[in-house]
Swiss-Prot record:
Membrane spanning residue stretches: 37-57, 84-104, 116-136, 150-170, 179-199, 315-335, 350-370, 427-447, 452-472, 541-561, 567-587, 934-956, 976-996, 1048-1068, 1167-1187, 1191-1211
PANTHER family noted in UniProt: ABC TRANSPORTER C FAMILY MEMBER 15-RELATED, ATP-BINDING CASSETTE SUB-FAMILY C
Domain ABC transporter: 630-853, 1257-1489
Keywords for the protein's UniProt record, in alphabetical order: ATP-binding, Membrane, Nucleotide-binding, Repeat, Translocase, Transmembrane, Transmembrane helix, Transport
UniProt: ATP 1 binding residues: G665, A666, V667, G668, S669, G670, K671, S672
Record organism: Arabidopsis thaliana (Mouse-ear cress)
Reactions the enzyme catalyzes: ATP + H2O + xenobioticSide 1 = ADP + phosphate + xenobioticSide 2
Name of the protein in its database record: ABC transporter C family member 9
GO molecular function: ABC-type xenobiotic transporter activity; ATP binding; ATP hydrolysis activity; ATPase-coupled transmembrane transporter activity
Organism classification: Eukaryota, Viridiplantae, Streptophyta, Embryophyta, Tracheophyta
Sequence positions that bind ATP 2: G1289, R1290, T1291, G1292, S1293, G1294, K1295, S1296
Subcellular location: Membrane
EC number(s) reported in the record: 7.6.2.2
Gene Ontology process terms (BP): response to nematode
GO cellular component terms, A-Z: membrane; plasmodesma
Amino acid sequence: MFKPFGFAAETGSHLLTTQWLQLGNSLCLKERISIAMQVTFLAFFLIHLALKWFGVVRNRGSNDVEEDLKKQSITVKQSFSYNISLLCSVSILGTHCFILLLLFRDSVVSRCDSSVSVFSAEVSQSFSWLFVSVVVVKIRERRLVKFPWMLRSWWLCSFILSFSFDAHFITAKHEPLEFQDYADLTGLLASLFLLAVSIRGKTGFHLLESSGNTEPLLLGDQTEQNKKDSYSSSSPYGNATLFQRITFSWINPLFSLGYKRPLEKDDVPDIDVKDSARFCSHAFDQKLKTTKEKEGPGNAFFYNSVLRYVWRKAAINAVFAVVNASTAYIGPYLINDFVEFLSEKQSQSLNHGYLLALGFLTAKIVETVTQRQWIFGARQLGLRLRAALISHIYQKGLVLSSQSRQSHTSGEIINYMSVDVQRITDFIWYVNNIWMLPIQIFSAIYILQKHLGLGALAALVTTLMVMACNYPLTRLQRNYQSDIMNAKDDRMKATSEILKNMKILKLQAWDNQFLNKVKTLRKKEYDCLWKSLRLQAFTTFILWGAPSLISVVTFVTCMLMGVKLTAGAVLSALATFQMLQSPIFGLPDLLSALVQSKVSADRIASYLQQSETQKDAVEYCSKDHTELSVEIENGAFSWEPESSRPTLDDIELKVKSGMKVAVCGAVGSGKSSLLSSILGEIQKLKGTVRVSGKQAYVPQSPWILSGTIRDNILFGSMYESEKYERTVKACALIKDFELFSNGDLTEIGERGINMSGGQKQRIQIARAVYQNADIYLLDDPFSAVDAHTGRELFEDCLMGILKDKTVLYVTHQVEFLPAADLILVMQNGRVMQAGKFEELLKQNIGFEVLVGAHNEALDSILSIEKSSRNFKEGSKDDTASIAESLQTHCDSEHNISTENKKKEAKLVQDEETEKGVIGKEVYLAYLTTVKGGLLVPFIILAQSCFQMLQIASNYWMAWTAPPTAESIPKLGMGRILLVYALLAAGSSLCVLARTILVAIGGLSTAETFFSRMLCSIFRAPMSFFDSTPTGRILNRASTDQSVLDLEMAVKLGWCAFSIIQIVGTIFVMSQVAWQVCVIFIPVAVACVFYQRYYTPTARELSRMSGVERAPILHHFAESLAGATTIRAFDQRDRFISSNLVLIDSHSRPWFHVASAMEWLSFRLNLLSHFVFAFSLVLLVTLPEGVINPSIAGLGVTYGLSLNVLQATVIWNICNAENKMISVERILQYSKIPSEAPLVIDGHRPLDNWPNVGSIVFRDLQVRYAEHFPAVLKNITCEFPGGKKIGVVGRTGSGKSTLIQALFRIVEPSQGTIVIDNVDITKIGLHDLRSRLGIIPQDPALFDGTIRLNLDPLAQYTDHEIWEAIDKCQLGDVIRAKDERLDATVVENGENWSVGQRQLVCLGRVLLKKSNILVLDEATASVDSATDGVIQKIINQEFKDRTVVTIAHRIHTVIESDLVLVLSDGRIAEFDSPAKLLQREDSFFSKLIKEYSLRSNHFAGSNDLLS
C-alpha cells in the first residue's frame, strides 16, 4: 500500500530533505529520471532560445520587408503530421496539468511514496510540454519545413521513458490500476504518434500563393527544392501523408487499376526524387570523392563511401528494427503472467486479463508497424544504392583504359551490374539483423533468467556456442561464393563473346565446339554451387536444430540445479526459444548474404579503381591562339605500357587548320594507333599532343546504335532539316533512304545487323559530318564501300562538305592519296615518310611500293579492258553519264524497293512478356523436371514430420509440467526431458533431410533448365539473333539463371513449409478453444481476397521489372563497344543521362513491387492480430476449469507467431510467383524455333563432297522474314567447279545475302541451291558448312590465343599452323611476340588491328583447304601490296578449287573466270569479264570505265617509278 501524499501536512526543511533521500526507492525511479530529463531539456531549450534571440537582435531589420511580403502573399495549409503533433502535445500537457490539480487536492495518483518527487516530476513535465506546445504553434508561424532537431529528440526521449517504465508497471504489477496508470497509457499512445512524426521529421506544410498554386514550404535553396518537388509531384509516395506511409495506402489507386486490367508501363507512377538515379548517383559521387581524398585508393574507401552514403537512412531503419526486436519479446515476457492469471482466475479481476490481452495486442501492433517500416526502408535504401552503383559502374566503363578493358571484358562488367550489385543491395535488407540479433538474444536471456533463474546462463552459453560454429562455416562459404562468382564471370564472358559472334560460329560450323565450351564452364560453376548449397544445408541443420538443443540444455540445467519448471515458466521459455528461432534461423541467410556481398563489393571496388584513359594525354587549345589543329611533339605511345617496344615512337606531326592528311602503310604499321594518340585513347609515354577544335571520329569497325538511322546520324544533336539534307547527300545516303520502308526512320538492329558494311560506314560518316566539328579523324572510311560510292564520298564529303575542315584519314586505297595536302607513310610504329604525293614518289624510300602495287592492279584492269575492246578516254560528259548509269543500280542490303515501301517491318521485336496469371504448366515444368517431381512429396513429408515433432515436443512439455510450483509433476523430470530431447532430435534430422533434398532438387532443376535454354539458343536461326538484343539474352543467362540456381527452390519450398507451419498453429489453437476456428474462417477469406487483389498488380509489376532490366544491360554493352566514339564526340554526359533514365525505368516497377509487398503484409498482419486478440479475449472470458491453463498457454505461445506465419504464407506465395517469372522467361528461350538439323541421318554427303565444287542456283528467292520483302529474286545461274567467280554490285545489292543463302544462314523461301548434284536443303547444316570455307566481311577473333583462333577444333599440327601463318603474312608479327602461337587475343581481338584480324581469318581457310572458298570483302582492310600477295596465295592454294569473291576492289575480281553482277536482288549480268567488257552498255563495263577514269591520273606514276 502507498501512503497519502498530504502536501498540506508535510512542512519543514528536514521533511523535505528526508523526502529527497527517498528517491533511491525503485518505485520513484521513473520520477527521478523524468525530473533529470525535463531539467536538461529546459536548460538546452533556454540556451538555444537565448542564442537565437541574440542572432535576431544582431540582424534586426535586414530581412523585415522581404519577410512581410512573403507573409502577405503566402498562406499555410496545415498537414496531418502537424495537426497530430499539436494535438498529442496539448493532450499530454493537459494530462499533467490535471494530475497537478489532483495532487493539490491530496489525491493518490502514483505508486511513488515521495510526494516531492511526484510533484517535482509533474511540474517539470508540465513546463516541458508547455514549451513544446508553444514551439509547435510557432512552427506554423515560422513556416518550417521540418520540426527542429531538439523537438524531435525530446519526443524520442519521451517515448523511450514512457515505454520503458509505463508498459512495465502496467503489465507487470497485479495491484489495482491507479489513475496515473491510465494517464501513462494515454501518454504512451500519444508519445508513439509523436515518435512517428519525429522520425519522419517533416511538418508537411504546403504554402498557398496568391496565384493559387500549392507548393511545399521551402527552406534554404529554394530553386533546388522546387526542382525536387516538381520531380516528385507525380509520385504518390512523395506526396503521401504520414498515415498513408504507415499503412501504405498511397498505393491503393495502383491496386485498383491493376485489379481491373493488366497494368501497362505508363500506369506505373514515378518514383520520389530521392529515389531517382540522378539524385542517388550525384549523392554517391560526392561521398566517393570526399572519401577518396581523405583515405586514398584501396577497397576501404569504397566501403566507407557506401557507409557514408547509406548511414542516415540506415540509422532510421535501425531505430525501427530495434523497436521491432524489443516489442517482439513482450509476448513471451507476458505468457507466464497470462498462465498464472488463468490458473488463479477466481482471485483475479477480469480487467487484469483484458489489460494483459491489450498489452499483447499493443505490442504486436507496434511490432508490425515497425517491422513493415524497416523492411520497406531497407528495400528503398537498396534501390537507391543499386541505382548509384549501376550508374558508377556504367560511368567507369566509359573511361576505362585499354589495359583495363583487356582485364575486364563486357561479360564480366555486365555481371557486376546484374549479379554483384544485386547481392550488395540484398545485404541492405539483412544488415538490420546485425544489431537486432544481440537485442533478440539478450531479451530472450532476460526473460529466461526471470522465469528459470540461472538456467538462462546455460541458454546463453549454448547460444553463443552455436553461433561460434558459424565462424569456420562462414569462412568456407565465403571461399565458395568467390569461386561461384569467378566461375559465373568466366561463363558470362564466354557467352557474351559467343552471342556477338554467333554468325561466325555458324558459318564455320563451330557452334557445337563453343556450346561444349560454355557447358564446361557451367560444369565448373555447377560444382561450386553444389559445394555451397551442400554447406548451406549443413549450416541450416545446425541452426534449425539450435533452438531445440538450447531448450534441452536449459531444461536439463534447471533440473540439475533444482529450478522448479512450472507450466508458465516452461511455456514462456518455449515461446522465447520459438522467438529465438527467427534470429538463429536467419543467421545462415545473414552470413551467406554477408559473404556474398563482401565478395561482390570487393569485385566492384577493384573495378572502380581500374586505370582510366589519360586525362592529360591531350592538351586542348583555343583556335584563336594557334593556327595548328593537331600537333604532336616527340610522341611515344603504347597500348601495353610495360612493353619494351612502344606502339608508336618518335612521332612528330603538325597539321594546320583545313589540311587534308592521309595516313597509309602496311597492315599493323600503326595507322589507327596514330589517330588514337590524337584522341587520347592510347597511353602516352612521352611527348606532347595538342589539339585545337572540336573533334569527330569514324572508327574502322562501324559502331551503330540500336534505333533509327536518323538517331544514329543526329547522335544527340538537334534536327535541322537543311543541314541534315546536306549531310545525307554528301554521304551518298539519299537513295538508300528512298528505298527503305521508313526512310531514315527505319530501325537499325543491334550493331547494325540489318545493314551492309558500306551502309553502316556511311551512316557513321554522316554522324561525324552532322556534328560540324573542326577536326575529323576517319579510320579507313572507304574500305567497306564500292568504287563508285567511294568516289562520291571522297568528292562530295571529304573534298566537298568538309573542304574547310581539318581531316586526317587512314586509307589503303592509293587513288585517294594525291588530293591530300600531306601524306604520312607509317611503318613499324613510326612515320617513315611525310609529304605530298609527288614528293614521296621521288624519295624512293617505301611509298612507291604501295603505289606500285596499286599500279600493277590498275595495269591488269587496263590490259583486260584493252584486250576486250579499244579503250577510248571518256570526256567529262562520259564520266557524268557513267555516274548516272551507275546510280540507277542503287539498292539497299535488304532490297526494300519502292513497291514495298508500304510494308512496315520492325526488325528488333519488343521483348515477349506474358500477361495475367503465370500458367500452371510453368509450375509443373519446374516441379517435374527432376525425376518427374518425385522429390517433391519427400520434401513435403520431411517438413510435415518436422512440424509434427515440434508440436509434439512442445505439447509434451506443456502437458507434463506442473501448473504451479506447489503442484506435483505427472512424470519424473528426467523422463520428461528424455522424451522431449528425442522428439527434438527427430525434428532436427527432418530438417537435414529437407534441406538436402531441396538443394539437390533445386540445383538439378536449374541445371536442366540452363542446358535446355543454352541448346535452344545455340540452335536458333540467325534471324533470332538479328532481332534479339544481346543484353536480353544475357539477362536470362545471368540474372534469371541466378534466381534458379540459388533462390527458386528455396522460395517454393518456403511456400509449402509456411503453409504446414500455419496449419500446425491453427491446429494447436483450435485444441485450446475451438471457437477460434469461427473467427479464423472469415479472416482466412479476407486474406485470400487480399492475396487475389494484390497478385494481379504485383505480378505485372514484377514482369515489368524483369523486362526493364534488359535495356540497362543492352545499353551498357553498346556503350562499352563504342566508348571511344562516345569520348571522341564528347557525348559522355548524354549517354550517362540515358543510362540514368533506363535505371529509373527499372526502379519504378521495382519500387512499387516492394511497396505492394509491404501493403499486403501490413494488412495480413493486422488481420492475424485480430484473430490473436479474439483468442485472448476468449480465453480470458471463459469460466475457470473449462480449459487447461497450461494448454491455453501453449495456444498463446503459438498464437504469438500467428501474424508472422499468416503473412509469411501469403508473402512466400507472392514472392515465389514473382521469382517464377524467371522460370517463365527461361522457358521462353528454351522453346525458340530451331534452324534445320545439324546432321540428317540417311542424307549425309560423301566424305570427299564437294569434290568438283559446282554451285547451281535455281529460281532462288530469299527473304529475311515472312513480314520482310524478298531480298534475292529469281536467281538462276551456275558457278562451274574449279572456277573463280567474282560477285559485284553496289553497296547493299544483295551480295552478302547470296553468300548467307549458300551457307543456309538464311533459308531460301523459294528455289534451290545445288552443290555437286546435292541439294543443300536436304543435308544437315554441319555437313554443309563444315565443307565450305569463308573469310567473312567482319573479321572476328575470340578471347584466347592465336592458336585457338586458327585451329579451335585442334585438328592441325604446329608445322601446318606456322605454314598457314607465313602464307597470310603474319609470321613476322607473331614470331616477334614472346608467346608466339600462344600470343594473347583479348575480347573481340581488340589488341590486333582490323587488318591483322582479317589475315587470321585468311589463315583459317588456308588450314581448312575447302574445295569451295568464299571471300566476302576478305582484303578490304589491308593495303594494296598485301592484297596483291594474298590474291597470289589464294590463286596458288586454291587454283583448282571454286573461289567466290565479293569485293569492292575491281582488280580483285577482274581476273575471275566469271563475274556475277547483282542489282535490286536480281542478276543484272553473268559472264566472263572479257565478254562483259565487250558490251559498252554493261554495268560491269561502266564500273571498270569509271574506276579507270578515277585512277587515270596515276598513269604518269609509272614513269616516276621506273
